[in-house]
Design a protein with these regions (language model features):
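Hydrophobic ligand-binding cavity/cleft-lining segments
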Residues: 1-42
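Hydrophobic-ligand-binding modules of eukaryotic lipid transfer/binding families
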Residues: 1-9, 47, 91, 135, ...
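Hydrophobic/aromatic beta-strand elements that line small-molecule binding cavities or substrate pockets
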Residues: 6-8, 58-65, 88-98
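Solvent-exposed residues in well-ordered beta-strands and their adjoining turns
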Residues: 9-13, 50-52, 64-66, 77, ...
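Short, intrinsically disordered, mixed-charge
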Residues: 19-32, 127, 131, 139, ...
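Glycine-rich portal/gate segments that line the openings of hydrophobic small-molecule binding cavities
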Residues: 38-85, 106, 139-146
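Beta-strand/loop substructures that line and gate deep hydrophobic ligand-binding cavities in soluble
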Residues: 79-136, 143
Length: 146
């Protein structure tokens, strides 16, 4: 089960970072490939992603856990989705911690994807792609909050 973690520190107050990462409508501004977000509720939303070929792909997420100013966990709903054939589990965890001395914020992004069937053979590729996605997300998040 590929688990990939990336972390960074931002010269931005915790509440500014939290306001961005906790708002699904801000995802197109910082999460890679997200074109727009639809059907937002307190418990979930749909990301419309752009494939490598330029086609839109819908990915439904639920908010599994939220501790204000500390942690968010998103679970991707895989049943009856284009991702169901390859994945049996997919989740993203966002952890935040404030450095009270400097006023900066540490951000940890963690992606967990459990592959299904023969797709398990692609684990190294999935891990690399997840690492690129998380690194891009951190870079874009930094541009927004700093």
């Amino acid at each position: 089960m590929p688990v990939v973690t990336r972390h960074s520190g931002f010269d931005a107050p915790l509440d500014r970072v939290w306001n961005v990462v906790s708002d699904p409508y801000s995802l197109p501004r910082w999460w890679p490939r997200v074109q727009r977000v639809e059907e937002v509720s307190d418990s979930g939303w749909t990301m419309v992603l752009l494939s490598d070929r330029g086609k839109p792909i819908r990915a439904d997420y639920t908010l599994a856990e939220s501790r204000p100013m500390q942690l968010l966990e998103w679970n991707q709903e895989l049943e009856e989705s284009p991702f169901e054939r390859m994945l049996s589990q997919s989740k993203i965890v966002i952890e935040l911690a404030e450095n009270e001395d400097s006023g900066s914020t540490a951000v940890v992004l963690r992606s967990t994807e459990r592959l299904r069937g023969l797709a398990r053979l692609g684990s190294p590729m999935v891990r690399r792609a997840a690492g690129r996605r998380l690194s891009q997300a951190l870079e874009r998040l930094g541009e927004l909050v700093e």
